[in-house]
Amino acid sequence: VPILVNSYFQSTSQVLSVQVTLFCAGFGTLFFHLCTKFKVPAFLGSSFAFLGGFSSVAALDTGIFANMADKEKLQYACGGIVVAGLLYLILALIIRCVGVKRVMRFLPPVVTGPIIICIGLSLAPSAVSNASTNWLIAIVALAVIIIFNIWGKGMFKIIPILLGVVISYVFALVLQGLGFTNPDGSVILNFSGVSSAAVVGLPPFILPKFNLTAILIMAPIAIATMMEHIGDISAISATVGQNFIEDPGLHRTLIGDGIATSISAMIGGPANTTYGENTGVLELSRVHDPKVVRLAACYAIVLSFIPKVAEIIASMPASIIGGVSFILYGMISAIGVRNVVENHVDFTKSRNLIIAGVILVSGLGFSDGLTFTIGSTSITLTSLAIAAIAGIVLNAILPGNDLSLIHISEPTR
């Protein structure tokens, strides 16, 4: 996310810091686990859903934003994210007051399943775009993951993603050492920032600033991310075989995610999310112990105080990220399909076909979102927000809704 966000700004230096992002991911994950009684094996990472918001804030050039430095624009974007995180608390309060069953009446598998599918498929262009920077390296990363996941033994079978990243990174180093470049002529690995970075140093934290325009750009994205959160928790539940929507409760997961997001933005980090990719990792590794996730969070915090590590991460070729994403994003969508199948959604019923169809088309069709104007301010809803709203509304108004709570069954091994 920092690599993508920084590409929206004109500055040649990091605007959104990798160090701060690592710290916020680690701290946010630990806080989330505290809120959820240490039961949910979720790692909070940077939300892709807010990329459009960052891009819009970066493009602002009127009023107070005219001739504004990139760092200051980031501060206003963070201010909007602080407000977005607080919206989670409102939904959590509603769930706490009326009960998760009444809320989940409006989010049966026919709604959450297609939303999970959209989460994965909506990220597919990002995977292809990143992989296309160097298809050879991307294919190596993809192949290594597949080989170790299918034919690996012992520990190697548990960590195919890490092996895919490390081996493809070494492969990229070898290619660069032999004089190869990316197809567009650019260097495969850029180590200019690594050599100048200190070994130990504090993350460059910054404080948010608040402006209504930036808030109205960033905060509505929470509509999508809250639905993504529910879909992610449903997917994690399906993967692990435990109903985390009931225990520790959806209100707790929302509180943990929302406050972690606001805290992250308060120190200059991106929005946190329960991370759909996390579900793919759980499925591939088959390691579901929350203690392992908390250990990973501690590693992230430690690494955030080592600038050289942050620069090495920043130097990772987009092609490696793309190759890994082919597996992870596909896993997310596949889990959405499994969620529908295991909950026996009856697609002989027209209402279910209509709901699922509208969600899928909305989630994939509105690639640029939907923009509307209130006064002089334009607000854009992302495709996932539109899909979620459409699915919830259709499920509520179409006849034949059994208003049943989502059922999480034991995952297929």
Label the model's feature ranges:
Residues 1-4, 77-79, 210-231:
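Core transmembrane alpha-helical segments of multi-pass membrane transporters/permeases
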Residues 24-33, 55-56, 84-93, 113-126, ...:
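Hydrophobic core segments of alpha-helical transmembrane domains in multi-pass membrane transport
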Residues 403-412:
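Residue-level detector of conserved catalytic or cofactor/ligand-binding positions
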Residues 10-12, 33-40, 262-266, 277-364, ...:
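Hydrophobic alpha-helical bundle architecture
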Residues 6-33, 219-290:
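Membrane-embedded helical hairpins/re-entrant loop segments and their flanking transmembrane helices
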Residues 132-225:
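Long hydrophobic alpha-helical segments that form multi-pass transmembrane helix bundles
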Residues 66-67, 129, 180-186, 192, ...:
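Membrane-interface helix termini and inter-helical loops of multi-pass transporters
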Residues 1-138, 285, 308, 315, ...:
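Early transmembrane hairpin of solute transport permeases
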